[in-house]
From Swiss-Prot:
Protein species of origin: Gallid herpesvirus 2 (strain GA) (GaHV-2)
Family annotation (Pfam families): Herpes_glycop_D
The encoding gene: US1141
GO cellular component annotations of the record: membrane
The protein's name: Uncharacterized protein US1141
Coiled coil: none
């Protein structure tokens, strides 16, 4: 009789231990990935195969940011003006200035390789807000722009990253269901072997959507141009959003889940283009006292007499391969995922999450040890 009682206790003990082990595995992951779900019950977006990430680095230039006025106060090209009226789809920002002509020039000079940088900014009253930054090294002039052996991850403004991504040509900025507050003057800066290609596009948002994300505009994030002499992505709290295509899929799924128009191919023809603006439009825009624009809170006036370019202040990309060997390799999964929930605190870092996982695992192990001791005592 005692034998059957002990066997029953033993099997109950084994079942309890197995359940604790399963709980430990789920908690140890720090998310719901063990069950194939995110915390919001949406499917996990797969990242690229590790082989597709072997040429990605966190940064190639020690986190430095060029100035949106890297070229001149005046634009290199006419300013394109587009109007977004398609309420729940994508706004496509594609200013003038194609890098293929620069690559062709390099090819004719016998240069087979180049380094490059692509950055997006939104301009305000005597200030600029970095939106996106990505660097390229050891690229081929015989291939389309961005065909490189080494790339950095895309560094993003945290708020723009939730609903924006860069198109597969590495150049166009795509914004999903933009709200009216995102109207403004956007600047794209391309630097190829130190030569800048600067181009602007004025976005006017007339149609908006019920789920368009608000609260993206923040005057405190629009920095005076003097900031960019020594500015870095760290000083701006910019984030790495993982592999570009996984980031793109995040944004598209967010739009689709909210009932937006998810077209198979995002094209620029969805935008209404009006007459182009002159090259000097940027200068007049920066000086305009329009209160609807970004306004650097530290500036007491709208004058731009003291605005100068910062070509000498940017010492980022070089042509020396040894400079890129110093940059640390990244992990294969996104460093900071793009979460759709607006309640998520931007202060939570992956390091804090790792410490929490360790503490939870230790607590579970202690409970398991107690069960083993108690079970051994009962069996004896």
């Amino acid at each position: 009789m005692n034998r059957y009682r002990y066997e029953s206790i033993f099997f109950r003990y084994i079942s309890s231990t197995r359940m604790i082990l399963i709980i430990c595995l789920l908690l140890g992951t720090g998310d719901m990935s063990a069950m194939g779900l995110k915390k919001d019950n949406s499917p996990i977006i797969p990242t690229l195969h590790p082989k597709g990430n072997e040429n990605l680095r966190a940064t190639l230039n020690e986190y430095k940011i060029p100035s949106p006025l890297f070229d001149t106060l005046d634009n290199s090209y006419e300013t394109k003006h587009v109007i977004y009226t398609d309420n729940c789809s994508f706004a496509v920002l594609n200013p003038f200035g194609d890098p293929k002509y620069t690559l062709l020039s390099l090819l004719l000079m016998g240069r087979r390789k180049y380094d490059a940088l692509v950055a997006w900014f939104v301009l305000g009253r005597a200030c600029g807000r970095p939106i996106y930054l990505r660097e390229y090294a050891n690229c081929s002039t015989n291939e389309p722009f961005g065909t490189c052996k080494l790339k950095s991850l895309g560094w993003w403004d945290r708020r723009y990253a939730m609903t924006s991504y860069i198109d597969r040509d590495e150049l166009k900025l795509i914004i999903a269901a933009p709200s009216r507050e995102l109207s403004g003057l956007y600047t794209r800066l391309i630097i190829i072997n130190g030569e800048p290609i600067s181009s602007d596009i004025l976005l006017t948002v007339k149609g908006t959507c019920s789920f368009s994300r608000r609260g993206i505009k923040d005057n405190k994030l629009c920095k005076p141009f003097s900031f960019f002499v020594n500015g870095t992505t760290r000083l701006l709290d910019m984030v790495r959003t993982g592999t570009p295509r996984a980031h793109e899929e995040n944004v598209k799924q967010w739009l689709e889940r909210n009932g937006g128009k998810h077209l198979p191919i995002v094209v620029e023809t969805s935008m209404q283009q009006v007459s182009n603006l002159p090259r000097s439009f940027r200068d007049s825009y920066l000086k305009s006292p329009d209160d609807d624009k970004y306004n650097d809170v530290k500036m007491t006036s709208a004058t731009t007499n003291n605005i100068t370019t910062s070509v000498d202040g940017y010492t980022g990309l070089t042509n020396r391969p040894e400079d890129f060997e110093k940059a640390p390799y990244i992990t294969k999964r996104p460093i900071i995922s793009v979460e759709e929930a607006s309640s998520q605190s931007p202060k939570i870092s992956t390091e804090k999450k790792s410490r929490t996982q360790i503490i939870i695992s230790l607590v579970v192990l202690c409970v398991m040890f107690c069960f083993i001791v108690i079970g051994s005592g009962i069996w004896i």
